[in-house]
Amino acid sequence: MSVKISRSVYADMFGPTTGDRVRLADTDLIIEVEKDFTTYGEEVKFGGGKVIRDGMGQSQVTNKDGAADTVITNALIVDHWGIVKADVAIKAGMISAIGKAGNPDIQPGVDIIIGPGTDVIAGEGKILTAGGFDSHIHFICPQQIEHALMSGVTTMLGGGTGPSHGTFATTCTPGPWHIGRMIQSFDAFPVNLGISGKGNAALPGALIEMVEGGACALKLHEDWGTTPAAIDNCLTVADDHDVQVMIHSDTLNESGFVEDTIKAFKGRTIHAFHTEGAGGGHAPDIIKVAGLENVLPSSTNPTRPFTRNTIDEHLDMLMVCHHLDPSIAEDLAFAESRIRKETIAAEDILHDLGALSMMSSDSQAMGRLGEVIIRTWQTADKMKKQRGSLSQDSARNDNFRVKRYIAKYTINPAIAHGVSKLIGSVETGKMADLVLWSPAFFGVKPDCIVKAGMIVAAPMGDPNASIPTPQPVHYQPMFGAYGRALTASSVVFTSQAAAAGHLARDLGIAKALYPVSNVRGGISKKSMIHNDATPNIEVDPETYEVRADGELLTCAPAEVLPMAQRYFMY
């Protein structure tokens, strides 16, 4: 017997379905469900008097014979490839299926089997995304990692050794000894981690030593001397070992101008950090590289989006992070040369055009690692308010814009750093690094963070209460963040040379090493999903005005942002 119910009642019970629209947090961004993989009348839902019970939605199939370990039911998946409603199966820590869950003995169209050995995470009315990937981390303190995780970031890549002055300023872990000690420390943290070695050297020996010692990338930073010779040598070593190179170029233009740096690239693939330039790079025109085919450009989040406070806060940040003295005129001039409202405004628009491909933090070194996701969506919202709907979107929804922006902190950094076969999207065969959000809190405060199929963090009420919801509610690590479950549910990214050797044995680590691959000639700007635009970018050296294909890129700073004080006390 069938019964008709209204869309609103259906959405309240099973979550939105095809054609329903959902607002993201308190932004103006609206998504519309493109497809529903579940079957009307055969939806599965857990709870008293609900469907997932023995002989009903739960079959007798064992896990060995194909039942899922976990099913996330009726979730609204938001990813670069689509915005769809589906059940998601997790098996052995990997996403094993996206489709319709249930009991195939009595239900039609079941491609995810629920058995006695299957747990359930209720996704009704929730949004499901891939865990975030922050590819610009200064490992200044270990407490960063918990803050990032609680924001929805499950993978972090960067450099450093702790609160040394080299780490305060540069995203580099120098030398195999430091790299080894950092990798040993990674056994304590329930996220995927990777180390970038110092790439500043004119001869290859020391760089090869770091790559073989466990670095999964090399970082060129101006504070260590990003000369054309160092750039060329670093890229040569990277080509030989299939690791990525990230660059923070020469703000002072001492060893050359942006054209000299581009020449040193020799057309080779490189990840350009804080491409706008406030975080560092040839003043005033490093932003030009965002239009090159071989450059994978990213932003750091303190300039995201351009607001009335952006300029003022940057000078103090820069002084602290780069060991500058405000009483020295040259240091002050160095700082002021990097902070330009014209290029920061253009950065907003270049993100909206898909010319800037990735978002990252620059953690504690002119960036806030707990705000990568928030600031991505604040930028998207600001651009919708100021520029209207994208041509690829309809009047009903912002689906393409949302796919463009979510790719900036999920799949694109995974592609850029050679790990997209394992992480970066909600797709079968990938590690189940997933984040559930209530739509009203999307991008701000996750409901649940899953790492390799196990809940690793969530908001949790008073542990002494009779139910899990009473105040005070805090984000807390869960069982997936402890013991051997932690090391079994996350990996360390390394070079192929390190993974093929005896590094894991020599360091005595419990986490698996995962070798990065296909980060050199096999990828380019065209590999950046929804963010592959290559406009010709020009910067006026006197006014700092930015033009893309001849069009002036400018916008007003935001006075008010969504996803801000409505959600936080401070």
Swiss-Prot record:
GO terms for biological process: urea catabolic process. Its EC number is 3.5.1.5. Carboxylation allows a single lysine to coordinate two nickel ions. InterPro entries: Amidohydro-rel (IPR006680), Metal-dep_hydrolase_composite (IPR011059), Metal_Hydrolase (IPR032466), Urease_alpha_N_dom (IPR011612), Urease_alpha_subunit (IPR050112), Urease_AS (IPR017950), Urease_asu (IPR005848), Urease_asu_c (IPR017951). Binds 2 nickel ions per subunit. One of its GO terms (cellular component) is cytoplasm. Ni(2+) 1 binds at residues 136, 138, 219, 362. The active site is at residue 322. The modification N6-carboxylysine is found at residue 219. PANTHER family: UREASE. Belongs to the metallo-dependent hydrolases superfamily. Urease alpha subunit family. Heterotrimer of UreA (gamma), UreB (beta) and UreC (alpha) subunits. Three heterotrimers associate to form the active enzyme. This is Urease subunit alpha. It comes from Rhodopseudomonas palustris (strain BisB5). The lineage of its organism: Bacteria, Pseudomonadati, Pseudomonadota, Alphaproteobacteria, Hyphomicrobiales.
